[in-house]
């Protein structure tokens, strides 16, 4: 039998893409998490805490193949069934809205917590990001989409982003073009993958091989290039005037943009009508927020009206999730240096009362021990008995 010798380095090693968060960053992340949840509460969103793992039968239902691939799966030792560790909290809130609430009208939910990815979304991403987000159930009107996009911009402001930049699209545009061309499910999936990669050369070759009608082929060729400022909507409107579903989607984007730009004049709105992220479960607008120096979205969301259908309660729904961990890595929320008050504890009741009063005010009071190092404890003040009264003075 081969004996494996473990070194200290082996015991310290974490799985690839899994990280620990040390105090300075942890405090910054938790501070932003609290600010976001307070923001969502102020807008009427109720916090929920979904379980970290569920049966895959419910966790992955209606969420699309991309979430399935991201989900880490294990066998439940009690039931023998397959469990999934959540890779996305949205399907969980959809189940909760359908099963755990008795609200017939609008239901606003928010959350914050870890998700776990079986593989990183990109080479620099963590597999254990911390997300915060909202879900708005029961409202199909444009007003709900406006509220959600507005709240995303508010979230970016709270996070301290120097620029507010959002990409907007609508999956209904590609869906209408695909239906008009009579694509099979397999063809729709093939072109979806090419469009997602913006593989222009391959798109031209695929269209030539699969779309015999010149008019319909032109729509597929045009789609990847429909990206830019709000003028893109007018360009698309002239090209797809014969497709009512596309015009409806463009009207929806135009009206949403008008309100959002009036509310947040400094925000940059970029329209990508070939954006099909989440195509398999999203049904309307799709959006993502980007930050300088980071090539992947720091937040994303959209409308997904049919996700609750599999739980027996189809409800309109829209929402987003913010990647708090990514924001921390980018340095926008900054690390919090915490100062503290040192004290040599004795049995004086007056001293204990002073310590309790300081802690009640939010001060960090640390008892000195023989092994304690003031520099490591980050103490910059001390509690001393002066003139018969315990007072906080600068550390000598």
Swiss-Prot record:
Pfam families the UniProt entry points to: tRNA-synt_His
Transferase in keyword set: no
UniProt record similarity statement: Belongs to the class-II aminoacyl-tRNA synthetase family. HisZ subfamily.
Natural source organism: Cellvibrio japonicus (strain Ueda107) (Pseudomonas fluorescens subsp. cellulosa)
Presence of the UniProt keyword Amino-acid biosynthesis in the record: yes
Function: Required for the first step of histidine biosynthesis. May allow the feedback regulation of ATP phosphoribosyltransferase activity by histidine.
Pathway note: Amino-acid biosynthesis; L-histidine biosynthesis; L-histidine from 5-phospho-alpha-D-ribose 1-diphosphate: step 1/9
InterPro entries according to UniProt: aa-tRNA-synth_II/BPL/LPL (IPR045864), HisRS-like_core (IPR041715), HisRS/HisZ (IPR004516), HisZ (IPR004517)
Single Gene Ontology BP annotation: histidyl-tRNA aminoacylation
GO terms, molecular function: histidine-tRNA ligase activity
Alphabetical keyword list: Amino-acid biosynthesis, Cytoplasm, Histidine biosynthesis
Other facts noted in the record for this chain: This function is generally fulfilled by the C-terminal part of HisG, which is missing in some bacteria such as this one.
Subunit structure: Heteromultimer composed of HisG and HisZ subunits.
SUPFAM superfamilies: Class II aaRS and biotin synthetases
Name of this chain's protein: ATP phosphoribosyltransferase regulatory subunit
GO cellular component: cytoplasm
Subcellular location: Cytoplasm
């Amino acid at each position: 039998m081969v004996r494996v010798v473990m070194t200290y380095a082996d015991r310290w090693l974490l799985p690839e893409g899994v990280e620990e968060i040390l105090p300075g960053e942890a405090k910054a992340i938790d501070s932003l998490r609290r600010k976001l949840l307070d923001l969502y509460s102020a807008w009427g969103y109720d916090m929920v805490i979904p379980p970290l793992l569920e049966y895959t039968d419910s966790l992955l239902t209606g969420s699309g193949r991309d979430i399935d691939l991201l989900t880490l799966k294990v066998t439940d030792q009690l039931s023998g069934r397959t469990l999934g560790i959540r890779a996305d909290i949205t399907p969980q809130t959809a189940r909760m809205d359908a099963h755990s609430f008795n609200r017939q009208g609008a239901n606003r939910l928010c959350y914050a917590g870890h998700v776990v990815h079986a593989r990183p979304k990109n080479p620099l991403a963590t597999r254990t990001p911390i997300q915060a987000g909202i879900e708005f159930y029961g409202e199909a009107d444009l007003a709900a989409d406006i509220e959600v996009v507005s709240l995303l911009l508010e979230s970016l402001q709270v996070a301290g982003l120097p620029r507010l930049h959002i990409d907007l699209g609508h999956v209904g545009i590609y869906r209408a073009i695909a239906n008009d061309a009579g694509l099979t499910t397999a063809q729709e999936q093939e072109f979806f993958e090419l469009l997602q990669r913006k593989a222009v050369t391959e798109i031209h070759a695929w269209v030539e091989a699969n779309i015999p009608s010149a008019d319909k082929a032109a729509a597929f060729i045009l789609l990847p290039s429909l990206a830019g400022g709000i003028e893109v909507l007018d360009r698309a409107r002239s090209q797809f005037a014969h497709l009512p579903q596309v015009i409806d989607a463009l009207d929806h984007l135009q009206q949403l943009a008008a309100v959002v730009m009036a509310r947040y004049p400094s925000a940059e709105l970029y329209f990508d009508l070939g954006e099909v992220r989440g195509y398999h479960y999203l049904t309307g607008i799709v959006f993502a927020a980007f930050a300088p120096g980071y090539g992947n979205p720091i937040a994303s969301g959209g409308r997904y009206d049919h996700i609750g259908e599999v739980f027996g309660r189809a409800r309109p729904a829209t929402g987003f999730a913010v990647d708090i961990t990514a924001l921390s890595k980018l340095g926008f929320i900054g690390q919090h240096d915490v100062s503290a008050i040192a004290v040599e504890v004795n049995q004086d009741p007056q001293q204990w009362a002073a310590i309790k009063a300081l802690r009640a005010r939010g001060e960090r009071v640390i008892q000195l021990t023989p092994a304690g190092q003031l520099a490591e404890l980050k103490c910059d003040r001390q509690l001393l008995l002066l003139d018969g009264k315990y007072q906080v003075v600068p550390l000598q």
